[in-house]
Amino acid sequence: MRIEQELKLGFKDVLFRPKRSTLKSRSQVELTRDFTFKHSGRQWSGTPVIAANMDSVGSFAMAKALSEHGVMTAVHKHYTVADWAEFIKENDASVLKNAMVSTGTSEADFQKTKDIMALTDDLIFICIDIANGYSEHLVQYVEKVRAEFPDKVISAGNVVTGDMVEELILAGADIVKVGIGPGSVCTTRVKTGVGYPQLSAIIECADAAHGLGGRIIGDGGCSCAGDVSKAFGGGADFVMLGGMLAGHEESGGEVIEQDGKTFMKFYGMSSQSAMDKHSGGVAKYRAAEGKTVLLPFRGSVHNTISDILGGVRSTCTYVGAAKLKELTKRTTFIRVQEQENNVFGKE
């Protein structure tokens, strides 16, 4: 047993220190980023925010809506090949280039991914997603997928430390997904005692990935636009959002009427609800590691994503970053014990 004494930080532990800026307006800030990925050599240009691959967030409708903003969606893995064929038939490359095909690591998952990717050349992203990215099986699976798809962009995770980021990149991942337990409907840290504060995880994993020419996704922990900015400031190349994009008409969640009000069900992908729906219940050897909540129906996602991106633009003006790419270089975090004045409630 050993104890690491260094304090690790989450988004609530810091604020940006403002800096002199020549920017006169948020409209001058460029949020689009251009990436060329290490292994595939593929290029992608867009706003590096991703809707999470949860079946009450990462729907086909969400992918279509967010593509209008240049934002990506990691489409959840529970759509069939026939569902994908219909989606591809109805949408052009401008939508498909911003849709990630999510997969697990079983042999059936591998075959399904091959079947989906064979439908069109316009799909370029594969998201290999398991809760515990420290499994040697994941590394082997990444190698297998890379051998099968040498020209596709592969994301793999989830992990929270630099050593595993490096191993996954060397195995063939272009992007590593970072985050264990920070999500709003995730209870992994409570059920297992395992995790890592998300901002420190991003800072450390970004350093490891960038040293090898790889990229990272900060996955989870954002509850407001300021947190999204902090993730980018900490070095995340992409930021993945679940709860912030849940509860919308495009989210794909179950709509429930209660006392004349409309709600949408939102749950973690290791929750009782998810396992009842997709696995026939919680296996005897497992514990559910997610919550199920009812969110007030929030209407169209277009307003929400515009508000989030507006907040990130505003962050950039406060620290003098004319481009999102510059934000991490312009970032100085100060440690704090308070974030906001809640006398009239939380924002």
Swiss-Prot record:
GO terms for molecular function: GMP reductase activity; metal ion binding. Gene3D superfamilies: Aldolase class I. The keyword Metal-binding applies. NADP(+) binds at residues 108-131, 216-239. Its EC number is 1.7.1.7. It catalyses: IMP + NH4(+) + NADP(+) = GMP + NADPH + 2 H(+). One of its GO terms (cellular component) is GMP reductase complex. InterPro entries: Aldolase_TIM, GMP_reductase, GMPR, IMP_DH/GMP_Rdtase_CS, IMP_DH_GMPRt. Homotetramer. Belongs to the IMPDH/GMPR family. GuaC type 1 subfamily. PANTHER family: GMP REDUCTASE (PTHR43170:SF5). Catalyzes the irreversible NADPH-dependent deamination of GMP to IMP. It functions in the conversion of nucleobase, nucleoside and nucleotide derivatives of G to A nucleotides, and in maintaining the intracellular balance of A and G nucleotides. This is GMP reductase. It comes from Aliivibrio fischeri (strain ATCC 700601 / ES114). The gene is guaC.
